[in-house]
Amino acid sequence: MATTKSFLILIFMILATTSSTFAQLGEMVTVLSIDGGGIRGIIPATILEFLEGQLQEMDNNADARLADYFDVIGGTSTGGLLTAMISTPNENNRPFAAAKEIVPFYFEHGPQIFNPSGQILGPKYDGKYLMQVLQEKLGETRVHQALTEVVISSFDIKTNKPVIFTKSNLANSPELDAKMYDISYSTAAAPTYFPPHYFVTNTSNGDEYEFNLVDGAVATVADPALLSISVATRLAQKDPAFASIRSLNYKKMLLLSLGTGTTSEFDKTYTAKEAATWTAVHWMLVIQKMTDAASSYMTDYYLSTAFQALDSKNNYLRVQENALTGTTTEMDDASEANMELLVQVGENLLKKPVSEDNPETYEEALKRFAKLLSDRKKLRANKASY
């Protein structure tokens, strides 16, 4: 927790010293962050489909894509996979996947991705089908070709350091210009679920640079929103097009953070008396879910507090279902029945109020966000025409 607090303070310091030559135009830095959660990625995918549909309707453009509206798109684990899908270009230099195609992707490939390998030793899944699909979909595309700034995290188990793949880092670290399928597999390679991923790129001197990577959640927790904001602020220092963040002016930043759902069952199921007798194996079965839920909650707490304190609470929206039950809590239940339930979770979430204190539904809030995104895109287009 202390590390996250220090990180947030650092972000504030960066924001406070960021110069702006573009803010007078009413620009906004727009950030989309997508959590990890395995097959539960169906939940944010359902939300993204709704948002992209709203943007298409508002702008009367059936070809409108999320990458056209967000300056930064960040994701961890399955969120990193979604990030790649909506930002990697196809042969026409447009995102290879529309938001409405993501849920069908899970239905088509999820059962084979999460098909147990049958091995007694090693991870639960061999990852071969996941890699095959990623190679087919993403091709030879590399980070520098992404249609907007991306933030995809992983963790190198050889160096014991997080690895953050972004376009803005490539000038100083060209070895990070990896293939998108390598990055997408790496950020999803959750320990015990999939094997770690080894691959090699080249440094500026042409030397080989090796990566030994696992799931990005190991490095940045399951909610990458803070990480995505830090990249956005660094961009603001370097590029006038992103320079509208100034002096803690969160009114110039729009952050949409999408969760993959958490469960409220922990406090109903476990007591201190019961857990006192647990072995290491018992803890291993539940600690990851507990950690993910707690870290996601705290990230949301820090961000919502910051935006509210800086009179910009309407510029941050966290879309999260906090009461998953039964099979929907699992990261790897890719049965058709469970995936249908996850779609229902996403659709029902749109009708729920944002919070107890805010009767606005997520659907209404997303429509409001879509209007801001649309207006901001038109503003930039008008400026470019002069």
From Swiss-Prot:
Protein family: Belongs to the patatin family.
Record motif DGA/G, residues: 215-217
Compartment(s) of residence: Vacuole
Sequence ranges assigned to domain PNPLA in this UniProt record: 32-229
Positions of the catalytic residues: 77 (nucleophile), 215 (proton acceptor)
Protein name: Patatin-17
Enzyme Commission number(s) from the entry: 3.1.1.-
Domain observations: The nitrogen atoms of the two glycine residues in the GGXR motif define the oxyanion hole, and stabilize the oxyanion that forms during the nucleophilic attack by the catalytic serine during substrate cleavage.
Alphabetical GO biological process terms: defense response; lipid catabolic process
Positions of short motif GXGXXG: 36-41
Function: Non-specific lipolytic acyl hydrolase (LAH), an activity which is thought to be involved in the response of tubers to pathogens. Catalyzes the non-specific hydrolysis of phospholipids, glycolipids, sulfolipids, and mono- and diacylglycerols includng p-nitrophenyl caprate. Confers resistance to southern corn rootworm (SCRW).
Positions annotated with a glycan in the UniProt record: 202
Ranges spanned by the short sequence motif GXSXG, renumbered to the chain: 75-79
Residues of the signal peptide: 1-23
Top EC category: hydrolase
Further comment: Patatin have a dual role as a somatic storage protein and as an enzyme involved in host resistance.
One GO CC term, this protein: vacuole
